[in-house]
UniProtKB/Swiss-Prot annotation:
Residues 33-55 are annotated as: Disordered. Belongs to the peptidase S1C family. This is Serine protease HTRA2, mitochondrial. SUPFAM superfamilies: PDZ domain-like (SSF50156), Trypsin-like serine proteases (SSF50494). GO terms for cellular component: cytosol; mitochondrial intermembrane space; mitochondrial membrane; Nebenkern. InterPro entries: PDZ (IPR001478), PDZ_6 (IPR041489), PDZ_sf (IPR036034), Peptidase_S1_PA (IPR009003), Peptidase_S1C (IPR001940). Residues 139-302 are annotated as: Serine protease. The chain crosses the membrane at residues 64-82. Serine protease that shows proteolytic activity against a non-specific substrate beta-casein. Promotes or induces cell death either by direct binding to and inhibition of BIRC proteins (also called inhibitor of apoptosis proteins, IAPs), leading to an increase in caspase activity, or by a BIRC inhibition-independent, caspase-independent and serine protease activity-dependent mechanism. Can antagonize antiapoptotic activity of th/Diap1 by directly inducing the degradation of th/Diap1. One of its GO terms (biological process) is proteolysis. It comes from the Eukaryota. Residues 42-53 have a biased composition (Low complexity). The gene is HtrA2. It holds the Pfam family Trypsin_2.
Amino acid sequence: MALRGCHRLEVIFKRCIASPVLHSQAGNRRSSQLAIKGVDPNSNGNSGQYQQNGEHKEKGWRRLVRFFVPFSLGAAVSAAIIQREDFTPTIAASKMTGRRRDFNFIADVVAGCADSVVYIEIKDTRHFDYFSGQPITASNGSGFIIEQNGLILTNAHVVINKPHTMVQVRLSDGRTFPATIEDVDQTSDLATLRIQVNNLSVMRLGKSSTLRSGEWVVALGSPLALSNTVTAGVISSTQRASQELGLRNRDINYLQTDAAITFGNSGGPLVNLDGEAIGVNSMKVTAGISFAIPIDYVKVFLERAAEKRKKGSAYKTGYPVKRYMGITMLTLTPDILFELKSRSQNMPNNLTHGVLVWKVIVGSPAHSGGLQPGDIVTHINKKEIKNSSDVYDALADNSKTLDIVILRGVKQMHVTITPEDP
């Protein structure tokens, strides 16, 4: 259709340029211009200067005709073509709507459960923004509402072990509320928050025991503080033991997925196609390898927490009393090292153990000391680090500062960190 329109324009332009009307108009205009000067247009006397000026003006007129006529006619012809012909898409709007309705199953899942996902901010009460005067954001994460009266589920590492801070929750509609930490299980990395609001949208909890490898799942949350973010993928494994991930004191078979779980996504829901939470987003090792806590394990935590609340006390296990460094880490097991080396050429071939830093809290001692996500800790105070337990032992030591040897890509570096007392 566009080619037909261009062909019509070309034909009309040629006819216009060859038209005697335009030439006669140009001649008449030339005569009138010479007449204004008081010169006979047919005179051949000593009027060379005027004749030269006339020829110059004639050339200028022709330039104007050649320049403006095609554009004017082009606009007119284009308008005529638009009136006569429809620029319809290849697929009719009604059919497109039907296909979108039939095949956009991810959008259907999100529409049914996104209202129950919240954005969590950890505010540093010691440092304030210069312009607004409000406490700066030290960290962020995600969570989801599990009771209409304001009970929210998230990861423990999102909200605890951060001194001099307060927790704020932003709902999907933009409203923000202060939150209190109610229940904590640091061993399983689960926690609940409470905000003083009622009649909230609640996330339905599914059954992780019925999951199969290859099932579609959707991860919702706030990666890198970008709230209301949706990523999708499949379940890569339903039985990834915590021992394979080097996580101490945890007897959990994690859900492995290739749905992107990035910093800030922690604590958000991993949802099946029925819109039910079947896991809590927990950690990412590298692109395409992320892990979530199975919802069946979460239900046990919630039941114990509810029993404690009925008795008038909060459910807190493994609550930290150690010094604070401000990182989230993962032990580099042989399986994880193999995956990292296969996906990155910057991993040293002789690296056999260490701890991967996959999140650094802004404003924390680790952040001030220069640690970055992706660094691999190999030594602390000249002691070899083989797993995350060694890092906890170093924090429990009485040393005022920690001299940490890290690998950043293929480069070995030293950073010095002064942990904060609890």
